[in-house]
């Protein structure tokens, strides 16, 4: 009996020591489990939103067939004949010194929605004695590629890096227009401080003083009223937005 009681006592003492040991180890075990949980990546959530698609102006954006371009692009002068058009890239009077490929006529095209908005800008300006002159609208992809080639030939990669020439332009979508204001009485362009296609900070919309600053703001305000957005590094450049834009390479004829 005494031996049995002694064994029970030893057994209880062992259990107590074992329990005490486990309790002392519990904080360490819990800490280890917490570290492991933090280090383990969460399981994929099938209901989570998909990653955001890349911007529309990427090389992955396919070029739409010419037949599609014909249905979506509109000649701005067919909607408002009083808008003046002087496509610089159809002539040698541009920074490359030669006409760009794809410019076969002095006609400015835009996506119809943008062309209609531009026509409204012209109509709003005329009571003020002002009108629009367009230097560029829709631009074939091949012309944009020719601009990039030119920067390589003349060793001016900075023009791409600094945002003055784009390798994939909203002009290719028919959703950008380069333009200025004219005085309807004289037919002359208003002073904007720099010529079109000036590749320097002087062409940044906010970098002007006196009459040039006033004229830049006149143009900007008139365009913004109809939904256009100015590119702040080029006082002449405005873009428009439509759902599901497409790139085009249809020649301008």
For each predicted feature, which ranges?
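Compositionally biased, low-complexity flexible segments
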Residues: 2, 6-7
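Short, positively charged and aromatic/hydrophobic N-terminal segments
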Residues: 19-20
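Extracytoplasmic cell-surface/polysaccharide-interacting catalytic and binding patches
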Residues: 38-137, 149-233, 241-253
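Positively charged n-region of N-terminal signal peptides that target proteins for export
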Residues: 23-26
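Bacterial N-terminal signal peptides
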Residues: 28-37
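Conserved metal-phosphate-binding beta-hairpin within the catalytic cores
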Residues: 238
């Amino acid at each position: 009996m005494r031996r049995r009681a002694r064994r029970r006592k030893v057994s209880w003492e062992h259990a107590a020591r074992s329990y005490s040991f486990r309790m002392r180890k519990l904080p360490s075990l819990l800490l280890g489990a917490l570290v492991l949980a933090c280090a383990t990546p969460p399981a994929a959530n099938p209901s989570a939103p998909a990653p955001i698609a890349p911007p529309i102006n990427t090389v992955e954006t396919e070029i739409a067939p010419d037949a599609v371009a014909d249905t979506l692009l509109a000649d701005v002068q067919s909607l408002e004949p009083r808008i003046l058009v002087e496509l610089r890239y159809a002539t040698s009077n541009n920074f490359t010194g030669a006409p760009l490929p794809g410019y076969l006529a002095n006609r400015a095209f835009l996506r119809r929605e943008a062309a209609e908005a531009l026509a409204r800008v012209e109509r709003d300006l005329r009571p003020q004695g002002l009108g629009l002159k367009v230097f560029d609208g829709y631009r074939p992809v091949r012309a944009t590629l020719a601009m990039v080639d030119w920067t390589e030939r003349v060793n001016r990669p900075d023009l791409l890096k600094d945002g003055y020439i784009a390798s994939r332009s909203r002009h290719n979508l028919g959703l950008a227009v380069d333009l200025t204001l004219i005085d309807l009485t004289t037919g002359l362009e208003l002073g904007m401080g720099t010529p079109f296609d000036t590749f320097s900070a002087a062409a940044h919309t906010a970098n002007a003083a006196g009459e040039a600053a006033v004229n830049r703001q006149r143009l900007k305000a008139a365009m913004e009223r109809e939904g256009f957005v100015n590119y702040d590094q080029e006082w002449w450049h405005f873009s428009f937005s439509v759902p599901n834009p497409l790139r085009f390479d249809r020649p301008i004829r």
